[in-house]
């Protein structure tokens, strides 16, 4: 993921003009990185170092989503729909 892609994600999911680190933005960025790394692992199935990094990212995203679900359920639901998560 390059800076341009990251900026687009931040602009799409930010809450206000100066927001770059809210839970919503962090989850969106992690989701993009997870999807990119998943494609990489399909091409390189024996890349175990990247697989471990993927597992860490998935765990971090899960924790952020759990926090968001507790603190702001409406935002959680809209984020899940926008990112097409949870089946």
Curated annotation (Swiss-Prot):
Molecular function in Gene Ontology: rRNA binding; structural constituent of ribosome
Gene name linked to the record: rpsO
GO biological process terms, semicolon-separated: translation
Domain of life assignment: Bacteria
Swiss-Prot/TrEMBL keywords: Ribonucleoprotein, Ribosomal protein, RNA-binding, rRNA-binding
Name of this chain's protein: Small ribosomal subunit protein uS15
SUPFAM superfamilies on file: S15/NS1 RNA-binding domain
Organism of this sequence: Pseudothermotoga lettingae (strain ATCC BAA-301 / DSM 14385 / NBRC 107922 / TMO) (Thermotoga lettingae)
Described purpose of this protein according to its UniProt entry: One of the primary rRNA binding proteins, it binds directly to 16S rRNA where it helps nucleate assembly of the platform of the 30S subunit by binding and bridging several RNA helices of the 16S rRNA.
GO cellular component, as recorded: cytosolic small ribosomal subunit
Phylogenetic lineage: Bacteria, Thermotogati, Thermotogota, Thermotogae, Thermotogales
Family according to the record: Belongs to the universal ribosomal protein uS15 family.
NCBIfam families, per database record: S15_bact
InterPro entries: Ribosomal_uS15 (IPR000589), Ribosomal_uS15_bac-type (IPR005290), uS15_NS1_RNA-bd_sf (IPR009068)
Subunit record text: Part of the 30S ribosomal subunit. Forms a bridge to the 50S subunit in the 70S ribosome, contacting the 23S rRNA.
CDD domains: Ribosomal_S15p_S13e
Classification via Pfam families: Ribosomal_S15
């Amino acid at each position: 993921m390059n800076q341009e892609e990251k900026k687009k994600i931040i602009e799409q999911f930010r809450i206000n003009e100066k927001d770059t680190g809210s839970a919503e933005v962090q989850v969106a960025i992690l989701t993009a990185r997870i999807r990119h790394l998943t494609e990489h692992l399909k091409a390189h199935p024996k890349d175990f170092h990247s697989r471990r990094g993927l597992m860490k990212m998935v765990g971090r995203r899960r924790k952020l989503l759990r926090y968001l679900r507790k603190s702001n359920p409406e935002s959680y639901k809209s984020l899940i729909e926008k990112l097409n998560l949870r089946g």
